[in-house]
Every structure is written in structure tokens, then in C-alpha cells.
Amino acid sequence: MNRQTVMENSMVPSTCARPIELYVFIDPLCEDCWSLQPLLRKLQLEYDRYFTLRIALRTSLPSMNLPCIQKNEDALACDKVHPTYPIIAVKAAEFQGKRAGLRFLSKVFEYSFLKSRNVSSFSVLVEIAEKLELDVDEFIRDFSSKNVLRSLQVDVYMAKEMEVDKAATFVFFNGNIEDEGLKVSGLYEYEVYEQILEELVGMTIIPDIPPPLEDLFQRFDVLATNEIADIYNISEKSAERELKKRLLQQYIERITFQDTTLWRKKQL
């Protein structure tokens, strides 16, 4: 498997602006993929100039063809539920822009693993689209469109070509399109991904200085205290102090789920 084969057959546009292409295969229902988010964000913040990130959804075509399940027989009250709905919904959100897709994916993780909501429910996915202020009518139309299914089929094809059989999986490609990709399945320490990136670039990579806290909340919707501490290489206590300053300034707001505290830009 090399990048030339994948790119020719998947019709995904390539770019030469950065030396590395990084494909990350994610399953919206996978807890490891949720845990991966802080690592991936930090990698983007520090080394974004070295790689182009492509998020692909890990799924399988047979499951896409299963009929939907209904919670009850009342057609007016029924809420359609199916395990493939979250994947379809992320793709539908992507049709409103790459960032919309990433924000939707993050919100699916939040609803599933923090709020314990059933993200396989169509009505819950529509609620997420509303929360993110997407065009909900467009989202619903795209959800059942052939274009979304074609986009998912591209991800399925890429996973097959890259021999990806689980999420989360990273696949790194260097500047030579004939070289094999380097596949890393599962979760590892941040330094492992740094080392791989450096080896593929072929020189010492220098991390970018993290942006001001306000800019961070412009880029990412929701962040945890420990994630912010890690990004700025400070203690959690120091991070919380800075966050509370912004809280008093009414720039951000705190949201708590059981024993987890998250922060986001204040909703108007």
C-alpha cells in the first residue's frame, strides 16, 4: 500500500504544501478515539506546518446496508436508531465544511461519553446539529443523500487499501508517493507520534509556540483543564487560575459532567 495507489483510487486531492500526510481513522463510538482528541489537537498546534491532517471514519459497508431500528411502533413518536447513524451524521456535517465535521465529531464524543446520551439516535444527532448552529435542514437532507454514502465508501476503500482494521489508527505518508505508509494502531504516548513525525521529515522538528488562550477557544469548542495545562506546559493549578480569570471576564464558561470539568467560549 502506497499513497499513489490510495490517492488515485479514492479521488482525495493531494497537497505538496507540507511534507507529511497524516490519515487518522476514527470511530465516533470508540472511547479510545475520544481519548485521542487531546493528543491530536496538541499535534496540530505544535506541528501543523509539517503535516496535512485527513480524518477518515472507520466503518464497514455491510453494516451500512442494515435496516434502521425503531424504538417503538408509533410512526409519529418513533425515534430511528442505528449504530451507523453517528458516522453518517459526521459525514453530513462535513458537507458544511471540514471544521463543521470536526466540531460535530467532538460533540458526538461529548454527548456519548460525558452526557451518556444515545448518539445512535437520529433525534439526538439533529439536536447536536442544532447546538452547533449548523444548517439543520441541510444536515437532514445530506444525512440521507447518496453523496454522504459515497463519501463514506471512500473512507471504507482507504481503510481497506491501508489495511486499517481498527480505530484509532494513524497512517503517515512522507513526501515520496511511492513509499509505503507507516501505520500506527492504538493509543501511545505523545512522544511516540513526535518521534515518527521527526523521522519521516528527516530533520529536527521544532514545536510552534501555543496560541493565546483566547485563540485556542476560537479553534476548539470544548477543552479540559488538564488538556490546557498540557498544551501550555504548566500545572493544572496554573491552568485553572488562568481559566478562572477568563471566566470572570465572561469570555468562557465552565461546564461540569460528574467529575469532569470542561471549558468553552461563552455562548451568546
Language-model segments: what does each one mean?
Residues N2-I20:
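A short beta-strand-turn-helix
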Residues E8-M11, L39-R41, V156-Y157:
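A generic local structural motif
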Residues T15-A17, H82, F220:
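Short, flexible turn/loop "capping" segments at secondary-structure junctions
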Residues C16, Y47-R49, L248:
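Short, structurally constrained coil/turn elements
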Residues Y23-F25, W34-F122, T225-I228:
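Structural alpha/beta surface segment adjacent to cysteine/selenocysteine redox centers
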Residues F25, V119-L268:
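C-terminal cap of thioredoxin/glutaredoxin-like
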Residues P28-S35, T169:
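Local cysteine-cluster metal-coordination motifs and their immediate loop/turn environment
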Residues E31, P62, D179:
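Flexible, glycine-rich phosphate/dinucleotide-binding loops
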